[in-house]
Amino acid sequence: EVFIGNFLKENSYRDDVLISTKSPSWLMEEKGDFEYYLDKQLEKLKTDSIDIYLLHALTKDDWNKVRKLRVLDFLDDSLSSGKIKHVGFSSHTEIDTFVDILDAYPKWEVVLTQMNYLDEYYQTGVMGLDELKRLNIGSMIMEPLRGGRLVQNIPPEVQKLWDCAEVKRTPVEWALEYLWNRNDVDCVLSGMNSLEQVKQNIQIASNVKEISESDQDLIREVARTYKTLTGNECTSCGYCMPCPEGVDIINCFNEYNIGKMLNNPKGSAMQYFSLIDEDCRADSCIDCGDCEFVCPQMLDIPQELEKVDKYFGREFNHF
């Protein structure tokens, strides 16, 4: 924020751009904290208003907390004063909490949510996009390249499929054009670490190709192939839930399988330890066996949870 503020002021660019930043919801302890952080951000950005202000990374617990702190009153006041022009939120939560947040406030205008061709049914996925479309709320997409994992170290099985495409694209083009061809996606945010990546994204965005039916079939086949590389065959059906000990079995397996699939244990560990409450992680399993009897895939769920616990390991528990 300090860098952006200085750059925009020194170059007189403020009127040429829209500024978006986020409120650190997890840091809020009392109602006055919302305005405190907003005023600090306005100071850093050297502006008197923020165009798009997001309540950032809302989890179920964070949402319940900030509602009690009357965050919606804060948003109303900030909109009325002009400190904020448009409001939204970002979230990696499940669909039920996502819908609760959407329905709680009629002034949401945009939501930042995770989506890519692997994550159609992960977190809120396509169901979340359906809800945004229903409410006429703008959608901004994060993780279009899955943190770069969809374009780096491509498994041979996946590359072989891409090579069969009638219209040749790079892995970056496949991932971005998949999203840009969806009528429920308004804006795609992709992290960039170099000027070369900036130029590459500009070039792709300036020449978006249509995704044909055969292209869609190929993308689905690539997604299926990636998923054969997972650690177990959990389908996230939910028959094992709720666990009597409170273990979040589905999300424990989701993060484990994504880490195995993309060969990215560190990235999945960050998600695992930051998004799953401590009491709901794999090591809370007591091997009661209730879940095994209802699993359609006949997974030995306690044994699989033990694998999850060993996979992430104690060395990752600093996130």
Please give the residue ranges for each predicted region.
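Beta/alpha (TIM)-barrel catalytic core signal, keyed to glycine-rich beta->alpha loops juxtaposed to Asp/Glu
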Residues: 58-235, 239-251, 266-275, 282, ...
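Iron-sulfur cluster-binding cysteine motifs and their immediate structural context
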Residues: 239-257, 290-307
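A short, structured active-site edge motif that brings together acidic residues
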Residues: 15-27, 53-58
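Active-site groove signature of glycoside hydrolases
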Residues: 42-63
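Glycine-rich anion/phosphate-binding loops
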Residues: 28-36
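N-terminal binding-site loop/beta-alpha segment at the start of enzyme catalytic domains
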Residues: 1-17, 74, 80
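Short Fe-S-cluster ligation motifs
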Residues: 261-290, 314-319
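Short acidic capping loops at alpha-helix termini that bridge into adjacent secondary structure
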Residues: 14-17, 48-52, 85-86
